[in-house]
Regions:
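Helix-loop-helix hairpins in multi-pass membrane proteins, especially solute transporters
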Residues: 1-110
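Glycine/proline-centered helix-kink
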Residues: 49-62, 118, 193, 225, ...
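Hydrophobic transmembrane architecture of multi-pass small-molecule transporters
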Residues: 313-414, 420
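Hydrophobic transmembrane-helix bundles of small-molecule transporters
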Residues: 65-180
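Transmembrane core module of solute transporters
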Residues: 164-285
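Alpha-helical transmembrane segments of multi-pass secondary-active solute transporters
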Residues: 41-42, 71-76, 138-142, 210, ...
């Protein structure tokens, strides 16, 4: 709703006419023209909102760093009140076609059940590893809740005359592939954690410095958005644009593979962020255009619902859980591996241990305290090296996954869908 209002007041265009059922183009040429318009318009819209999102993230990190985390909520409440005031001041004469309030809460129960399903799934994926999966009763109940709420939602939607979600949308081939592409994108995009882990472990940066480093993603969004608009207008096929997007994600992972080391440079960490955000923008803004080719407008709300579910909830949750759990497992693997050779027989480890013990004793520590401090220092160095090795290994596997996705989107057939009514 906010997007359509923004387009109406900023561009003096009634965007709802492009999505109202019954206003679909009647010919193939009309649909092709609409696809070209979407290919140029959607990247600009996504660029605008993604830049705003990054600015919000940076501002949140600054407020937390300079003040306290509670101030973030105070700021958000004040900003919402300001937005309400601006809305009343700048849009006082909006006329509705009827006297009835335009928001319908008839299907509030359906949406609530759907949200319960997603909440339970997200809880299981996020806290499963921490709580030892199904040995914890909360994970068990969350799984039961997700299954029961999911079955109830499907039953309600199938039996209703005017359902909240139309399952016929899943019969459209491009829609199914759109969901798959978004899933692959958001899972692989979870590799953005490599930069934060590397800078946090290897460079000892805090959250605010990491957030400041993340501002370079806006440059990548801008490059990706401009490139997407230009290539789309030139008529470049979707498969080549999708392949380019996954290629950029792979290049970002490859950069991290060769860059991760004990003496990394903070200034160089902006490059994987720019490369990854460029590839993300290519895919993020064009997948909806591909998925909704010749799609009847009656399926638009169902498409948006499923798109947001996959793009904003399921895929990021799965990707974050996958990368964090694998990182922890590989980190433990390398700690065990490196610790086997660290003893007093190892010249370098022995010299470092002895030097730390002597330094602690010079500071007035007892011999036992000095030995304990030296052991902790040795353990810390092993953990750092193990984490860097785990990040390097995962970056390599991410590169292979991106290459696989790139080949997949190139060899996939892209036939024009027959017109539906």
């Amino acid at each position: 709703v906010n997007l359509f209002t923004l387009i109406k007041y900023a561009g003096h265009m009634e965007a709802t006419e492009k999505i109202t059922p019954g206003n679909e183009p009647l010919t193939g040429k009309g649909w092709d023209k609409l696809d070209i318009e979407r290919s140029a318009a959607q990247p600009a819209i996504y660029l605008f909102f993604m830049v705003l999102g990054q600015l919000g993230t940076s501002l949140t990190a600054w407020l937390t760093y300079e003040y306290e985390w509670q101030y973030v909520y105070y700021f958000m409440m004040g900003l919402l009140l300001l937005c309400i005031l601006i809305t009343f001041v700048t849009m006082p004469y909006h006329k509705y076609t009827t006297r009835r309030f335009p928001i319908n809460f008839k299907q509030f129960g359906n949406a609530s059940i759907f949200c319960i399903t997603l909440t339970c799934i997200t809880y299981v994926l996020t806290y499963g590893k921490v709580l030892d999966w199904y040995d914890d009763p909360t994970i068990q109940w969350a799984t039961v809740g997700a299954v029961v709420a999911g079955i109830l939602f499907v039953h309600i939607e199938v039996t209703l005359r005017n359902p909240y979600y139309q399952f016929d949308v899943l019969k459209l081939r491009t829609i199914r592939f759109g969901f798959l592409f978004y899933f692959l994108l958001m899972v692989l995009n979870s590799s953005s954690m490599f930069v934060n882990v590397f800078t946090g472990i290897g460079m000892k940066l805090d959250n605010y410095q990491n957030a400041t480093l993340g501002n370079w993603s806006m440059l990548g969004y801008f490059i990706g958005g401009i490139a997407t608009i230009w290539l789309s207008v030139k008529g470049v096929h979707f498969k080549y644009l999708f392949a380019a997007g996954f290629l950029f994600l792979g290049l970002s992972a490859m950069f991290m593979y060769f860059e991760v080391q004990g003496a990394g440079l903070y200034e160089r960490m902006k490059y994987p962020i720019i490369i990854r955000s460029t590839g993300m923008m290519l895919l993020y803004s064009l997948i909806p255009t591909f998925a909704t080719q010749r799609m009847p407008y009656k399926y638009l709300s169902s498409w948006i619902c499923t798109m947001l579910t996959v793009r904003m909830v399921l895929a990021p949750s799965i990707g974050t859980a996958l990368y964090s759990n694998v990182l922890q497992e590989r980190q433990q693997h390398y700690i065990t591996r490196y610790a086997q050779n660290v003893d007093m027989m190892h010249p370098e480890a022995s010299a470092s241990f002895t030097q730390t013990v002597q330094g602690m004793q010079y500071q007035g520590k007892s011999k036992q305290e000095a030995v304990n401090m030296a052991a902790i220092s040795t353990k810390g160095r092993i953990q750092v090296q193990a984490t860097l090795s785990a990040v390097k290994e995962m970056a390599g596997w991410t590169l292979y996954a991106c290459l696989f996705c790139m080949i997949f989107v190139v060899v996939l057939p892209y036939p024009k869908r027959k017109l539906l009514t």
